[in-house]
């Protein structure tokens, strides 16, 4: 298996980074299903941070995406599934680990103030 973070880096929960189109190129060339994976690790290990907080990282494997999708549809579905699940996992984690909640709320407020550019596709 190949594991790829389509954003190209870790992201803080509640923030959005455009997905890189390389995953769509691999998808179109490999004729293999893509299994989206969402996690809440950003609650405990922030982007550009060496400091880590104690907590349990939750990883959720989502249903495989079929191999016959158009590139734009694939990117949109991949991003929608990962982001919505990651947000749910982050909220659940913040409920269990209250110290992570302020960063989550701050990131969500900042993200809502600047509109998303949507997935990076060509």
List PLM regions with ranges.
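Non-catalytic C-terminal accessory region of glycerolipid acyltransferases
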Residues: 1-122
């Amino acid at each position: 298996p190949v594991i790829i973070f389509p954003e190209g880096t870790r992201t803080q929960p509640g923030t959005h980074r455009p997905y890189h189109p390389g995953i769509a190129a691999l998808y179109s060339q490999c004729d293999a299903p893509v299994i989206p994976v969402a996690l809440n690790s950003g609650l405990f290990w922030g982007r550009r941070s060496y400091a880590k907080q104690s907590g349990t990282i939750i990883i959720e494997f989502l249903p495989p995406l079929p191999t016959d999708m158009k590139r734009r549809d694939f990117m949109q579905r991949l991003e929608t599934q990962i982001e919505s699940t990651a947000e749910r996992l982050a909220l659940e984690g913040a409920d269990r680990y209250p110290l992570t909640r302020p960063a989550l709320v701050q990131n969500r407020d900042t993200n809502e103030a600047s509109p998303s550019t949507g997935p990076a596709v060509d």
